């Protein structure tokens, strides 16, 4: 009697896809969420940001199993062909975006290639080739031969201006910068200077990123839209900050200093949730003052309606200088340290030590903590690894693992101690609670 062979990896992964997909479908139906669809009116988020944890986990599990199965059955021989298709899809999207093709297509209908080419002022034959390449990734659709319509993916660029800005920034800055990484390493191997980066190579200049960005109103707008899109996503949502730390236990009228807090979106969100707390947002004078700042403050207030009780104030401060506010309960650095190489990061942290000592305060850092390779689903890990490479390409900075964080604290001041590390469910970042221990 022959032995019964165990299921193959192909079958294991296929079963995992089936099981996870059934679970996801159950979650969507039980919550009354619309089913995902390739049609133009399909939901932008398959699982809404505020959905239960189980729904998010089901989506990730489905995507992870499906991706693994795709990679397995593709095999090594298809690696480069698949990558070739990927970059041609990227540049097909760039072409469609540049010539504003999406805006000429009705959201609830279709039109011929001939009419679309005329409206976009592009050659019809080339339009067909580019659009049909994009369609292989469900960007646009051809419901009947010769007729072009929106898909859920392409409709997103019509419905959401921030997504258009993100696409513009990706094509204008992100892709050229990533492409220059080899040249930057050859020219400045091991450099940690913010003026010796792939971004400097890509744009042929010798300024730090934000200084160069400020010289271009167009790129500044694109970058702002890109950041709004990123922060609007589930992984960067401010709810993770609001719910991820025990703010409610802080004494009445405690002061929270939001260092590098820009327009104060994080502080306004916290102020709306915790009316017993006060907030001081610190950033450069050009950020907290002026017409642009006033507009952003107004937008932040309207988004997090908290009344006019003045619990959020602003102070001009450069975090490379000593911390001027010495009576806070919590000093907060959200998405700050990852922009800086170790030397500058230690300066930023070191400037807080006297204030932490004086007020016996807590330092709260919300930033990326790199996972161990393979310890989380690859559909999530690759997002984090992308940010790590971006930090290196643009700033000569990096995302850090737990050991890196502990080392940088220790090298700043041996008394700085990581007391707690927590990653809220669905968050791309972790909350690091740090205190200054007695000698």
Curated annotation (Swiss-Prot):
Q: In which pathway does it act?
A: Pigment biosynthesis
Residues that coordinate or bind S-adenosyl-L-methionine: 283
- Give the annotated active site: 338 (proton acceptor)
Q: Which reaction does it catalyse?
A: norrubrofusarin + S-adenosyl-L-methionine = rubrofusarin + S-adenosyl-L-homocysteine + H(+)
Q: Which Pfam families match?
A: Methyltransf_2
Q: Which UniProt keywords apply?
A: Methyltransferase, S-adenosyl-L-methionine, Transferase
Q: Which GO molecular function terms does the record list?
A: O-methyltransferase activity
* InterPro entries associated with the record: COMT-like (IPR016461), O_MeTrfase_dom (IPR001077), SAM-dependent_MTases_sf (IPR029063), WH-like_DNA-bd_sf (IPR036388), WH_DNA-bd_sf (IPR036390)
Could you state one GO biological process linked to this protein?
secondary metabolite biosynthetic process
Q: What EC number(s) does its UniProt record assign?
A: 2.1.1.-
User: So which domain of life are we looking at?
Assistant: Eukaryota
Stated induction or repression of this protein's expression = Expression is regulated by the aurofusarin biosynthesis cluster-specific transcription factor aurR1/GIP2.
Q: Provide the function of this protein.
A: O-methyltransferase; part of the gene cluster that mediates the biosynthesis of aurofusarin, a red mycelium pigment which is acting as a mycotoxin. The first step is performed by the polyketide synthase which condenses one acetyl-CoA and 6 malonyl-CoA units to form the first intermediate, the cyclic heptaketide and yellow pigment YWA1. The C2 hydroxyl group in the pyrone ring of YWA1 is probably formed during ring closure by an aldol-type cyclization reaction.
Please name the PANTHER family in this protein's record: DUAL O-METHYLTRANSFERASE_FAD-DEPENDENT MONOOXYGENASE ELCB, PUTATIVE (AFU_ORTHOLOGUE AFUA_4G14580)-RELATED
Family recorded in the similarity comment: Belongs to the class I-like SAM-binding methyltransferase superfamily. Cation-independent O-methyltransferase family. COMT subfamily.
Q: What is this protein called?
A: O-methyltransferase aurJ
Species the sequence originates in = Gibberella zeae (strain ATCC MYA-4620 / CBS 123657 / FGSC 9075 / NRRL 31084 / PH-1) (Wheat head blight fungus)
